[in-house]
UniProtKB/Swiss-Prot annotation:
Functional note: Fermentative lactate dehydrogenase.
List of catalytic residues: R234, E263, H295 (proton donor)
Keyword Oxidoreductase: yes
Protein name: D-lactate dehydrogenase
Cross-referenced InterPro entries: D-isomer_2_OHA_DH_cat_dom, D-isomer_DH_CS, D-isomer_DH_CS1, D-isomer_DH_NAD-bd, NAD(P)-bd_dom_sf
GO CC terms in record: cytosol
Gene it is expressed from: ldhA
Record's keyword annotation contains NAD: yes
Gene Ontology biological process terms in this record: lactate metabolic process; mixed acid fermentation; protein homotetramerization; response to heat
Source organism phylogeny: Bacteria, Pseudomonadati, Pseudomonadota, Gammaproteobacteria, Enterobacterales
Length: 329
């Protein structure tokens, strides 16, 4: 099978090539996004492999179909960028990687949490300038505080497992409670309760039409003053404009974002010599109590190996006509 891989970085290529030694697919790597204009580059390929910011809308899928593509392989868990109804109508099979390394994402979320709490990012900059003052670096002891986790799939449960080690009270919201979470002593509550009682809130849920801007002005108003929020899931779970206002009035004490709702034209690229045109992003990133990372929570050697293995195994199952447990349509 010939496979066109879009949005490729060197780390993608390295691990896909290593894992492909066991599969023998013909891999063609492209460093640009899949769009309606670039879909023609998949000509002659039976499958395409895409990531979070590639375009899987109906026009793109129709173009891929014209060029003989049969399979769409997402090398990520989220699939909100793919029109599944259109794929089904066109007879295209879509597969994903539902769980690759939950601990990798959870550990990154914890890293953001600790960095924000103890102002490590600010201390790093100060000490580089020989400024060893501790003024303005006071954090809080996490032991005994309340953590609210929204979404208790594998990543959410991994997060809860770590937070339990901090000695925190654990609250969670998910329409489908997890037995693994309950075993950790997690208390499932409704969103208003989670918002009002949590000192720290961490998002670990997929993006759906129902939870778009889940954290909006109304949600922020229900939260404790000075709440910490960390998002390693999907950017559009947070209303960025409302977050700015909540930061200004100190409702949000600190905000960690590994994802951003308009990240498509920013993340995964070197923009250090560019003038960022996104004014909302610029306002957020200018805040000393906001920490951005560029959608890197998944980026460990173990996770990249797992993603590559599952992606190619999914395609192998489809090629052989076997049942694929990760098939969406």
């Amino acid at each position: 099978m010939k496979l066109a891989v879009y949005s490729t970085k060197q780390y993608d290529k390295k691990y896909l090539q290593q894992v492909n030694e066991s599969f023998g697919f013909e891999l063609e790597f492209f460093d640009f996004l899949l769009t309606e204009k670039t879909a023609k580059t998949a000509n002659g390929c039976e499958a395409v492999c895409i990531f979070v910011n590639d375009d899987g809308s109906r026009p793109v899928l129709e173009e891929l179909k014209k060029h003989g593509v049969k399979y769409i392989a997402l090398r990520c868990a989220g699939f909100n960028n793919v029109d599944l109804d259109a794929a089904k109508e066109l007879g295209l099979k879509v597969v994903r990687v539902p769980a690759y390394d939950p601990e990798a994402v959870a550990e990154h979320a914890i890293g953001m949490m600790m960095t924000l709490n103890r102002r490590i990012h600010r201390a790093y900059q100060r000490t580089r300038d020989a400024n060893f003052s501790l003024e303005g670096l006071t954090g809080f002891t996490m032991y005994g505080k309340t953590a609210g986790v929204i979404g208790t799939g594998k990543i959410g449960v991994a997060m809860l497992r770590i937070l339990k080690g901090f000695g925190m009270r654990l609250l969670a919201f998910d329409p489908y409670p997890s037995a693994a979470a309950l075993e950790l002593g997690v208390e499932y509550v409704d969103l208003p309760t989670l918002f009002s009682e949590s000192d720290v809130i961490s998002l670990h849920c997929p993006l759906t039409p129902e939870n778009y801007h889940l954290l909006n002005e109304a949600a922020f108003e229900q939260m404790k003053n000075g709440v910490m929020i960390v998002n390693t899931s999907r950017g559009a779970l947070i209303d960025s404009q409302a977050a700015i206002e909540a930061l200004k009035n100190q409702k949000i004490g600190s905000l960690g974002m590994d994802v951003y709702e308009n990240e498509r034209d920013l993340f995964f690229e070197d923009k250090s010599n560019d003038v960022i045109q996104d004014d909302v992003f610029r306002r957020l990133s200018a805040c000393h109590n906001v920490l951005f990372t560029g959608h890197q929570a998944f980026l460990t050697a173990e996770a990249l190996t797992s993603i590559s293995q599952t992606t190619l195994q999914n395609l192998s199952n489809l090629e052989k006509g076997e049942t694929c447990p990760n098939e969406l349509v």
